[in-house]
A protein has these predicted regions:
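Acidic, metal-coordinating catalytic segment for phosphate/diphosphate chemistry
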Residues: 11-51, 55-57
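Active-site segment of metal-dependent pyrophosphate-handling enzymes
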Residues: 48, 58, 68, 90, ...
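A glycine-rich, hydrophobic loop/mini-helix early in the fold
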Residues: 49-81
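Short, surface-exposed beta-strand-loop junctions and turns on beta-sheet-rich folds
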Residues: 38, 69-71, 147
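Active-site acidic-Proline motif in GNAT/NAT acetyltransferases
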Residues: 83-89
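Nudix hydrolase/Nudix homology domain
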Residues: 4-6, 75, 87, 114-116, ...
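N-terminal amphipathic/basic-hydrophobic helices that include classical n-h-c signal peptides
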Residues: 1-12
Length: 184
């Protein structure tokens, strides 16, 4: 690959720190807006994200592998779909957009599971947790993900605490699904 062919791919291999996110209170009420960079620089501005846990009819859980170029938790296994709300977007709109972009799925019925605040040293997220049962084809985005696969509940239990999964996934999965696996 020549140098000029590499440039477009390299440009995609990082997050856009100028994206505009809503800043919210812990009930989801919009208070203002900030860039991705401002939200992820340790300011701990509370911003909303959507998650979709995809189960198949066997009770297995689809997980994505985060690309190594991601600014948060690179190379770890994570929730099937996760993404930020754009400023002016509803959680439902963001969920459908992210599922289409990340997994190529358009025909699914999400179930709202819960809402919580995730705190880390770098950021604070208001997480809208959803699940769905889905047995159709999944086409993970080659630009946004490093693939994905279905995991059994035993595989997830064995991986917890070993540095393979994102801390956010571990805490969320234990909170909402480990003792009640299929909530689609």
């Amino acid at each position: 690959m020549g140098f000029l062919q590499f440039i477009p791919n390299f440009a995609r291999m990082r997050d856009n720190n100028e994206e505009i996110f809503p800043i919210v209170d812990d009930s989801g009420k919009v208070l203002g807006k900030a860039t991705r960079g401002e939200c992820h620089n340790g300011s701990r501005l509370l911003h909303p994200v959507v998650h979709l846990h995809v189960f198949n009819s066997l009770g297995e859980v689809y997980m994505q592998r985060r690309p190594d170029w991601k600014d948060i938790q690179p190379g770890k296994w994570d929730t099937a779909v996760g993404g930020h709300l754009d400023y002016g977007e509803t959680p439902e709109e963001a969920l459908r957009r992210e599922v289409r972009e990340e997994l190529g799925i358009t025909d699914f019925t999400p179930k709202n599971i819960g809402l919580y605040v995730f705190d880390s040293k770098r950021e604070r997220e208001l997480v809208y947790v959803n699940s769905a049962i889905y047995d159709g084809e999944i086409h993970p985005s080659q630009e946004e993900l490093d693939g994905g696969r279905f995991w059994t509940m035993d595989e997830i239990r064995d991986a917890i605490g070993k540095g393979l999964l994102t801390p956010n996934f571990e805490s969320e999965f234990q909170r909402f699904f480990l003792n009640n696996p299929v909530q689609g």
